[in-house]
Amino acid sequence: MYIRTVLDRALELRDRRSSSQGKDMIRQAVEYINGHYTDENLSLKEVAGYTNVSANYFSAVFSQEMQQTFVEYLTKKRMERAKELLRQGDKRSAEIAAEVGSKDPHYFSFVFRKTQGCTPRDYRMGGRRG
């Protein structure tokens, strides 16, 4: 019975440490993403490398801790910034796409419409749904 109790406590401690390390890694990754999301080449592999883990491990832990995938988080971050830019002025959609890290303005418009429920132009004109 004593050995069982010691083993249970050891496993509990290991799990707590593992969870804490995962949360620290995610905090570090989110800070990195938030500082680099406008880089059109930002990738899961790059962020995983920044946090010193494999891309597969990073992807699994990120999804589990954040309740969304890396791509979903990055897209959401970029769309939030795009909405700010659309509200602030009259930059063209292609300029905004480049500013938020999108390589292709047409794909940016497609993703914006898919995630926000309206085109960037409609959003600017007042059809703000997202």
Which residues are covered by each model-predicted region?
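N-terminal positioning helix adjacent to the helix-turn-helix/winged-helix DNA-binding module
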Residues: Q21-A29, T75-R78
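…primarily DNA-binding HTH/wHTH and HhH modules…
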Residues: F110-G130
